[in-house]
Amino acid sequence: MHRHSLRSTAIGTKGGRVATLHIEHPISDLDTWLGAFNRFADARKNAGVRAQHVRQPVGDPRYIVLDLAFDDAEAAHSFKKFLEDVVWQSKDLSPGLDGVPTARVLEDVDPRRLQ
């Protein structure tokens, strides 16, 4: 399994909470999916992705889970819309996609509230 990650911080550069675009879906195979994912590296950077974590469930090579961290929820929602309206609508742009993605924008719970 390939691992891609950048450092993440708890506070966005705008002073707000970091937002995460959490995506998961079935894939045809990892190499095909990674080829498509890697072609969008500049799009992720230009959209403000600050960290990325790509994972697969143990024992399930045909499923992918990824978290993309943004400075704020607005940027995460904007990139989610781009994926839904452009990338996932085209087999040419998403050849490794094998099913319907689930995508949600998440924000961290204030760690001071956790015990």
Residue positions per predicted region:
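Generic signal for short, ordered secondary-structure residues
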Residues: H22-I23, K45, R55, R62
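Short structural boundary motif marking the start of a folded domain
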Residues: R17-L21
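Intrinsically disordered, low-complexity acidic/polar segments
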Residues: T32, Y63, A75-H77, R112
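Feature marks short, surface-exposed loop/turn motifs that line or immediately flank catalytic pockets
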Residues: D29-D31, V58, D72-E74
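An amphipathic, aromatic/His-enriched active-site/gating alpha helix that lines ligand/cofactor pockets
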Residues: L34-H53, A69-R104
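Glycine-rich beta-strand-turn "strand-cap" elements at beta-sheet edges
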Residues: H2-G15, R50-Y63, W88-Q115
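Short hydrophobic/aromatic beta-strand micro-patches
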Residues: E24-P26, D67-A69
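Short, surface-exposed ligand-recognition loops at beta-strand->loop->(often short) alpha-helix junctions
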Residues: P26-A36
